[in-house]
Amino acid sequence: MSFSQVFHQSPRGWIEVICGPMFSGKTEELLRKIKRWKLAKIPVIIFKPKIDTRQQHLVKSRNGHSDEAIEINSPLEIYDYLTKDRFDVVAIDEAQFFSSEIVEVVKSLNDLGINVIVSGLDTDFRAEPFGSIPQLLAIADKICKLDAVCNVCGQLAQRTQRIVSKSNETVLIGDIEAYEPRCKLHQPSAG
C-alpha cells in the first residue's frame, strides 16, 4: 500500500515547534504531550535522528522520562513508516540535526491532515539559527519557546554555550560535559 493510499484527503493538521537552548526541557515537553495523546488513545509515532547517539531507540529527557523512537538518517524515511498504519500525530525530536528536507516532509504531512510536533535547538552555540528550525518556526501553528537557567548568574538562559573547544563545527553531540545554558550577558561571542 502506498503512502498516498493510506492518507486520503484529510483536513489539514497542525504544526507545533518546541524550541529553546539545551537544558530548557524541550524533550520533557515533547514527552509530556506525547503521553497526553497516548492516554487519549491517539496514535502517535516518534522519530529522532540517528546522529544523536546519546540514547539509542529512545527519546529521553534529563528527568528520566522516555519513550521509544524510530531512528532515521533522512526525514524522507518518515514516509516509509506511515504506509502501513495511520498515525494522527508525528513527533520529531532533535529536528535541528535533519537536512532541510524536514521542512517539506512536515508540510506534506500537515497537508495530509497529520499533526506534527517538532522539538529542537533554535540556535547553535554561536547563537546563530540552527538547521531548519527557523523554517519550521515560520510554518508552525504553535510555538513553545522554552528557557533554561544560566549556569553563571541564575537568570533565564536563551543560549547554549559550548564549554569544550574540540572544534568550531556546528554539530558536536554532547551533554553536560560539552554544553551549558547561558543568558545573553554570559555567552561569549562565537564559540
From Swiss-Prot:
It catalyses: thymidine + ATP = dTMP + ADP + H(+). Pfam families: TK. Keywords: ATP-binding, Cytoplasm, DNA synthesis, Kinase, Metal-binding, Nucleotide-binding, Transferase, Zinc. Transmembrane segments: none annotated. GO terms for biological process: DNA biosynthetic process; thymidine metabolic process. It is found in: Cytoplasm. Its EC number is 2.7.1.21. The active site is at E94 (proton acceptor). Homotetramer. This is Thymidine kinase. It comes from Mycoplasma pneumoniae (strain ATCC 29342 / M129 / Subtype 1). The lineage of its organism: Bacteria, Bacillati, Mycoplasmatota, Mycoplasmoidales, Mycoplasmoidaceae.
